[in-house]
């Protein structure tokens, strides 16, 4: 015991004399602690792995029934893997486009995950039905894009038709306004014309026209009919012919037609 005490005293004296050696010893102690911690972690990890192995073993028991079906499974096609790669790259670019911290570490981590996933997809086998769904993704995407394009074109045509209808409506509104202005102008012109007619005929308050009186000479003058008959030698025969023509059915129908026409004109 005295030898161990002397050795510890010597070590203490050496550490006091050489502080650098003291630092090295402290680092050694820290490294030993790290090793112990890692060993403990590895032990726990092994326990977890053993539990996971047990669960996997039970899952394999349940999956033995589907082993015959797995024989028909097929690996993923190259086009599907390429499509998956492009999708992942676009997602990575979208994530990295945002202003985030530690961008390089995130990029490295995402690229590593992408690489791991693509490596798994190279050996992955899927059922034929799922394979058809995966291979039809690009065609379905193209169909949806074509449908979206058709919808956009239809919307553009509808917008053009709406613009044309709006333009025609504006033109019709302008025409209606111009017609209203013309009607107002015509109404004012009609009022002015009525005023002129009133001034010309000098209509009094009773509504009777104040026309100039006819002279006695004009009243005693022969009528135009008498003057015309005086020029015809056989007046009686002409009067009979005129009477027959006046009482004929053609003349009566013509007179009724003229009366109806006048009635319609008066009604309008």
Curated annotation (Swiss-Prot):
Residues 170-206 form a coiled coil. GO terms for cellular component: actin cytoskeleton; cytosol; inner kinetochore; nucleoplasm; nucleus. It holds the Pfam family CENP-Q. It comes from the Eukaryota. The keyword Nucleus applies. Residues 58-72 have a biased composition (Basic residues). The modification Phosphoserine is found at residues 31, 50, 249. It is found in: Nucleus; Chromosome, Centromere. InterPro entries: CAD_CENP-Q (IPR025212). Changing residue 50 to A: Abolishes the recruitment CENPE to kinetochores but has no effect on recruitment of PLK1 to knetochores. GO terms for biological process: chromosome segregation; metaphase chromosome alignment; positive regulation of protein localization to kinetochore. Its main location: nucleus. Residues 1-80 are annotated as: Disordered. Component of the CENPA-CAD (nucleosome distal) complex, a complex recruited to centromeres which is involved in assembly of kinetochore proteins, mitotic progression and chromosome segregation. May be involved in incorporation of newly synthesized CENPA into centromeres via its interaction with the CENPA-NAC complex. Plays an important role in chromosome congression and in the recruitment of CENP-O complex (which comprises CENPO, CENPP, CENPQ and CENPU), CENPE and PLK1 to the kinetochores. Component of the CENPA-CAD complex, composed of CENPI, CENPK, CENPL, CENPO, CENPP, CENPQ, CENPR and CENPS. The CENPA-CAD complex interacts with the CENPA-NAC complex, at least composed of CENPA, CENPC, CENPH, CENPM, CENPN, CENPT and CENPU. Belongs to the CENP-Q/OKP1 family. This is Centromere protein Q. It comes from Homo sapiens (Human). The lineage of its organism: Eukaryota, Metazoa, Chordata, Craniata, Vertebrata. The gene is CENPQ.
């Amino acid at each position: 015991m005295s030898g161990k005490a002397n050795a510890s005293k010597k070590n203490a004296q050496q550490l006091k004399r050489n502080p650098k050696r003291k630092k090295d010893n402290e680092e050694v102690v820290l490294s030993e602690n790290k090793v112990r911690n890692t060993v403990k972690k590895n032990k726990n990890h092994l326990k977890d792995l053993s539990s996971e192995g047990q669960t996997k073993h039970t899952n394999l028991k349940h999956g033995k029934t589907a082993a015959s079906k797995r024989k028909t499974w097929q690996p993923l096609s190259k086009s599907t893997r390429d499509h998956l790669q492009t999708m992942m790259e676009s997602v990575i670019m979208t994530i990295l486009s945002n202003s985030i911290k530690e961008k390089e570490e995130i990029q490295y981590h995402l690229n590593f995950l992408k690489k791991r996933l693509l490596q798994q997809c190279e050996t992955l086998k899927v059922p034929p039905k799922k394979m058809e769904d995966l291979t039809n993704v690009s065609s379905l995407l193209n169909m949806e894009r074509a449908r979206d394009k058709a919808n956009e074109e239809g919307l553009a045509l509808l917008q053009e038709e709406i613009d044309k209808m709006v333009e025609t409506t504006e033109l019709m509104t302008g025409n209606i306004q111009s017609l209203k202005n013309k009607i107002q102008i015509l109404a004012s012109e009609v009022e002015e014309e009525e005023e002129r007619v009133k001034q010309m005929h000098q209509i009094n308050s009773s509504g009777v026209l104040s026309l100039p009186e006819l002279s006695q000479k004009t009243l005693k003058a022969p009528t135009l009919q008498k003057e015309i008959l005086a020029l015809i030698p056989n007046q009686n025969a002409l009067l009979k012919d005129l009477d027959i023509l006046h009482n004929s059915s053609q003349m009566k129908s013509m007179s009724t037609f003229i009366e109806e026409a006048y009635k319609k004109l008066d009604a309008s």
